[in-house]
UniProtKB/Swiss-Prot annotation:
This is Sex-regulated protein janus-A. JanA and janB regulate somatic sex differentiation. GO terms for biological process: cell differentiation; sex differentiation. Gene3D superfamilies: Janus/Ocnus (3.50.20.20). GO terms for molecular function: protein histidine phosphatase activity. Substrate binds at K37, S104, Q105, G106. Pfam families: Ocnus. The active site is at H63 (proton acceptor). Transcription of janA gives rise to two sex-specific and one non-sex-specific transcripts.
Amino acid sequence: MNRLQLLSKGLRLIHKMSEEALAGVPLVHISPEGIFKYVMINVFDGGDASKAVIRGFADCTWHADIFEREEEVFKKLGLRAECPGGGRIEHNPEKKYLKVYGYSQGFGKADHAQTKRILATKYPDYTIEISDEGY
């Protein structure tokens, strides 16, 4: 096998690994309850594949804190991340209720309708409301 064939084989292997890493990224990871900031993150593998995920943590003061935490995780998997926006989530597991609203001052407003669709993959039995009201 010549050097070009080895390089090509190696690149295919790396691409396959990043595709598998992307497939393993959960769509939703949010705090189990409370009101907290969230971000939508577009995660990309080394090729053309990508997916949008939702992250929100009560222990993060700023939207950027959430993004930076998750970006490090994705980098370790060989993935790239971008944040198109954020907002807030109210999570009441007792009532099986999620409310998505507001915006991020740093990243802008996420597409709350898309956020709702993504949240519904993890919380199919919840009532999920979206609103453009509030911060």
